[in-house]
Amino acid sequence: DDDLIDHPVEMGRPKVISFVVAGIVHDMVFTGVLPNIDFERIAADTAKICEAQIRLFEPESNTPPFGDHGARYVFLTTVTGNDYGGLEHRNSTALICSRKSLPIIGQNEQSKEYREFLGLVSHEYFHSWNIKRIKPAVFAPYRLDRATPTSLLWIFEGFTSYYDDLMLLRSGLISEQQYFDLVAETISRVNNDSGRIKQSVAESSFDAWTKFYQQDENARNQIVSYYTKGSLVALCLDLFIRQKTEHEKSLDDVMRYLWTHFGKNFYLGSQLGLREADVPEVLHQATGISQDELLNFLERYVYGTKKLPLKALLEAEGLKLTTLTKKSNTPVSLDIRTANREGQCVIQSVMQHGAAHQGGLSAGDVLVAIDGLRVNASNLEELLSRYQSKQKALVHVFRRDELRSFTVEFNTPLYAEFQLQPKKDRLATMAPTNEVEDTSEQMPSQVESEQ
């Protein structure tokens, strides 16, 4: 039983604010230096996220999943100068964020950092269903003495990554265009690493222990994230289902099917996990789409590396996906990522087929000079702005303790930025397939705790 280890413990004098959603008390616990933070706003916004997610999985009963083990949920949040992340637990989550991620009293606008924090909250809360109760069969029970690989993380993390921002939209915390911008950012991230055409999301899932969490300097050219590409697979699958069923069904119905058949009674005795072989049948039963069509989708985009049909699927929803046109005076690029190490400009990774790769530069090289002008950690962009595409420069680097020179031909940046916007005649929406009234209830006052 993982009961004890799945409940994090924190001792100190935290700031606690509580609210009630669907009859369940939710505590937001903050530790760290917390100057002028608007805790009431954070709690109110978080309550909207929780209510929207409960409504997704239980549109009729509006029942949260925590009845199987204590009627309470806790957001343990450590606030620091510059951190970000989270880990899901059965009826809690351990979060870490920067102070600038949290709104201050009197600040009405929603900052990019606060929106990212709300996305993190949404992601970890969604895991209360999707991984903490709906589990891969190999996680039932957990093996604590060894790594347990599964090829299904594209569902458990990818689908969760898809819904984390979608829930911000459905809860009214971001606008439709803000949501489209977030989707476009994800599309840009996935499409600017060549690993997407070399590793499938199923392979990425299975190799998480050995590759995704042990990335080297060539990772961006060889692997793909089951989080980001998994979220795009979920988007495509959602649109595919909607269009095949004339918007009668969606990925929402798949999540409810998974919840009803695999998650709802997991801690009440069933201990039934999802097997890889179950996926086509689950999709078929939840949507009514033929298994042949579903298998074709899975083979191409989950187990294969075919280009996701984003443009066509979005087009059918009245959405236009475009690549932003680069201006002629766009600065050239070496197509590298660099790090500042004691003032030195060190190449962290080299994009395959980019200018640096073609010129012979390598990860680990320390950039010394470009055409005789010294490079440091802060002036690389300014030096590159002097050049045009197809021009060449002599680049000096230290490789280990050896001074080397390379002739590099610059090009326009390989990075492609995508934009997603609704067409003027758009009729379709990304609305949920079931709606109920908002039943969230804010507790009348915050509660401070010294325990």
Where are these regions (language model features)?
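C-terminal recognition in membrane/secretory proteostasis and scaffolding
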Residues: D164-D165, I174-Q451
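Surface-exposed helix-capping loop/turn segments at secondary-structure junctions
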Residues: R55-H69, K135-A137, R170-E176, R242-K249, ...
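Juxtacatalytic substrate-recognition/specificity segment
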Residues: S18-L153
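Intrinsically disordered, low-complexity linkers and stems that provide flexible hinges
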Residues: D1-F19, K48-E51
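Solvent-exposed, acidic/flexible segments
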Residues: P35, F39-A47, Q110-G119, P149, ...
